[in-house]
UniProtKB/Swiss-Prot annotation:
One of its GO terms (cellular component) is extracellular region. Pfam families: Latarcin. GO terms for biological process: cytolysis by host of symbiont cells; defense response to Gram-negative bacterium; defense response to Gram-positive bacterium. GO terms for molecular function: toxin activity. This is M-zodatoxin-Lt8a. Keywords: Antibiotic, Antimicrobial, Cytolysis, Hemolysis, Secreted, Signal, Toxin. Cleavage of the propeptide depends on the processing quadruplet motif (XXXR, with at least one of X being E). Both the N-terminus (61-94) and the C-terminus (99-129) of the mature peptide form alpha-helices which probably disrupt target cell membranes. The linker region (95-98) probably derives from a processing quadruplet motif (PQM), found in propeptides of many zodatoxins, hinting at a fusion of two originally separate membrane-active peptides. It comes from the Eukaryota. Disulfide bonds: none annotated. Residues 1-20 form the signal peptide. Insecticidal, cytolytic and antimicrobial peptide. Has insecticidal activity against the flesh fly S.carnaria, and against the cockroach N.cinerea. Has insecticidal activity against D.melanogaster. Has hemolytic activity against human erythrocytes (EC(50)=6 uM). Has cytolytic activity against insect Sf9 cells (EC(50)=1 uM) and human leukocytes (EC(50)=3 uM).
Length: 129
């Protein structure tokens, strides 16, 4: 359970990093404009974008590929967990559970797992009280 939560947190972190864009403030643009003696604000934005382009492409390429690998592995783990939980919870065979999971969308599988682990966490919390 702990590893599953950590893996989901890592996936979310990599997704945020891969899709993040640098914030451009007016102060940064003014500095670029003064350094290059540009009168047009659009030229300053364009120059700043060109300066950061190579670093961003390298970072996004690395995190994008890593993100895809982690996402694929997380999806496989979620499918296996959903089948295992259905077998245990509903008392059906593994083949029947696999057929049910295959019929579900990824969103439905995630919701099913979140409900299951949410109930489990609530039970543990109530036992401690």
């Amino acid at each position: 359970m702990k590893y599953f939560v950590v893996a989901l947190a890592l996936v979310a972190a990599f997704a945020c990093i891969a899709e993040s864009k640098p914030a451009e403030s007016e102060h940064e643009l003014a500095e670029v404009e003064e350094e290059n003696e540009l009168a047009d604000l659009e030229d300053a934005v364009w120059l700043e974008h060109l300066a950061d382009l190579s670093d961003l492409e390298e970072a996004r390429g690395f995190f994008g590929n890593t993100w895809k690998k982690i996402k694929g592995k997380a999806d496989k783990i979620m499918l296996k967990k959903a089948v295992k939980i259905m077998v245990k919870k509903e008392g059906i065979s593994k083949e029947e559970a696999q057929a049910k999971v295959d019929a579900m969308s990824k969103k439905q599988i995630r919701l099913y797992l979140l409900k299951y682990y949410g109930k489990k966490a609530l039970q543990k919390a109530s036992e401690k009280l």
